[in-house]
Structure formats: structure tokens, C-alpha cells
């Protein structure tokens, strides 16, 4: 008997029990959506590495992935680069593999919860009756913040982080998610998929953040050719253009990025805070 949770719930729930009787329905193997992190092979989670070693099929985004990540796969793994495939073609590979009894690792840049086309792919898998699950990864903005040596939420400076992108050649933005609205909050702003519009964006954001607001651009964070640029909204576009960056970069804006910023102390660690109710 094999117990299967609903594919529509997104969990690959095979609970092994007694062997299935001859001729019984055998469910397809699972697809594992795996966050590949920002690129470095040693920034994958332990679970991600275990899945890559185990799965005989691996689909990966060749455009943004450090080839060393694929070194976690077994030598006999079938590797499929998805950068030139549409979603139907990608799904077809996954469905065929699972129907043949082969587990599939589907690598996603960064974390699958951000700009990974996860929803479109899982809907197709649900329609095909293929179970799937998700293994999170280190998002690109977190790797960028690490390289900058900064916290994005500094007490009494910024306690919110906005993760967004801008209107471009890609999917349209909802009307309620205009950049100007986010800028008015003056929260720490992280822009993905927007590096080609850096000059226009800097000008737009300066209206609320001010031209002297710290800004940074991190290209291919954690990878051998990574580039870190620091500046302000007044000059960050010049720095980006001088470096010739046109893709695979994250833009960060906000006072939390200010070097040596003077900030309040977190209440959580305030020495006068009453901790008598805490266990331990």
C-alpha cells in the first residue's frame, strides 16, 4: 500500500508501507524544486545536496548557475539545461522522467519562492498528477547583503524589506505595485531583474530616498566573478555602466546600507529588558 497526499497540495507524500500488489497503480516519482542559492556550490542546503546526489534527472537554469553546483549530482545524472526551453517543454521533461520511475531535481536560482515560475510549473504538474515538493535556498538578496556586510533591518532605521522588480520586457507588474509607492515607505528596497534600468530607477527613487541615499549593486553574488559596487542614488548608475553590468545583479537601496550607521539598540537584547519569563 502506498499513501499519496494530494498533488494539489504540493507535497510529494509517498509513505512506504507494504509492497504494492502486482498490477496495482504505481504513482509517478516526485519532482523536487530545489533552491540553488545565489550560485556558489557550497551555499546549497544539506537537503539540496542530498537530493541532487539521489535524483537521476536534474533540470537546471544554465544562465545563472555556477557549473560547480552540478558537481553535487551523481556522474550518471541526466542534466537538462532549461535556459532555451519554454515551460511546456520543461514540464514535459519532468513528466516523462517521473512516469518512467525517475526522481527529478528541478534547480531554481536563489530560492524557489522568488521569480522562479514555480506556480506555473506546479500547476502543470498537478494537472499531470505528478507530486512535487520544495526545498528552499539562499536567496540572491541575502547573499548580496552578506557581501556588503550589512543587515537590511537596522533598529529605528529600517524594519521592512521590499523585494520587487520593475516594468520591463518581462511579465507586467500589477498596477498596485508601482515603485513610487514602495519608495514612499523608505524601507530597504531590493530590486531584482532591473539592472538595465538602473539610471532611470535611481532618478525615480531619489525623489523619496534622496540623491545621497546609499545604494549598492551586487553582480553574481558568491560566484567567482562576483562584483560589488557601492555608491549613492546620485552615482550608482555611473558605477554600474562603468563596470558594464547588464544582468544577474541585485540592486539594494536604503539607509540601512550606510557604512558605520549610528542606530538604536534592539529591544530584544536590551540589558534592562525583563527576561524572567523566559525558560532555560
Regions found by a protein language model. Name each.
Residues 1-12:
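Extreme N-terminal basic, low-complexity initiation segments
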Residues 27-138, 143, 237:
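Class I S-adenosyl-L-methionine
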Residues 76-77, 150-155, 208, 232-235:
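Short, hinge-like loop/turn segments at secondary-structure boundaries
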Amino acid at each position: 500500500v502506498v499513501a499519496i497526499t494530494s498533488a494539489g497540495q504540493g507535497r510529494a507524500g509517498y509513505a512506504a508501507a507494504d509492497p504494492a500488489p502486482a498490477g496495482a497503480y504505481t504513482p509517478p516519482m516526485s519532482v523536487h524544486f530545489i533552491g540553488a542559492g545565489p550560485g556558489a556550490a557550497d551555499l546549497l542546503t544539506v537537503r539540496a545536496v542530498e537530493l541532487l546526489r539521489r535524483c537521476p534527472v536534474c533540470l537546471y537554469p544554465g544562465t545563472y548557475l555556477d557549473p560547480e553546483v552540478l558537481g553535487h549530482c551523481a556522474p550518471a545524472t541526466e542534466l537538462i539545461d532549461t535556459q532555451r526551453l519554454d515551460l511546456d517543454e520543461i514540464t514535459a521533461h519532468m513528466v516523462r522522467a517521473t512516469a518512467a520511475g525517475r526522481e527529478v531535481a528541478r534547480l531554481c536560482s536563489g530560492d524557489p519562492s522568488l521569480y522562479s515560475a514555480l506556480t506555473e510549473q506546479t500547476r502543470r504538474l498537478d494537472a499531470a498528477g505528478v507530486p512535487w515538493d520544495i526545498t528552499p535556498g539562499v536567496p540572491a538578496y541575502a547573499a548580496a547583503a552578506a557581501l556588503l556586510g550589512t543587515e537590511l533591518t537596522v533598529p529605528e532605521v529600517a524594519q521592512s524589506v521590499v523585494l520587487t522588480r520593475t516594468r520591463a520586457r518581462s511579465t507586467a507588474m500589477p498596477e498596485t505595485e508601482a515603485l513610487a509607492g514602495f519608495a514612499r515607505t523608505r524601507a530597504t528596497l531590493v530590486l531584482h531583474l532591473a539592472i538595465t534600468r538602473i539610471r532611470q530607477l535611481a532618478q525615480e527613487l531619489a525623489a523619496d530616498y534622496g540623491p545621497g541615499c546609499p545604494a549598492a549593486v551586487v553582480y553574481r553574488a558568491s560566484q567567482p566573478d562576483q562584483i560589488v559596487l557601492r555608491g549613492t542614488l546620485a552615482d550608482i548608475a555611473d558605477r554600474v555602466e562603468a563596470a558594464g553590468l547588464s544582468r544577474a545583479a541585485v540592486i539594494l537601496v536604503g539607509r540601512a546600507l550606510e557604512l558605520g550607521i549610528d542606530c538604536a539598540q534592539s529591544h530584544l537584547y536590551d540589558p534592562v529588558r525583563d527576561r524572567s519569563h523566559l525558560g532555560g
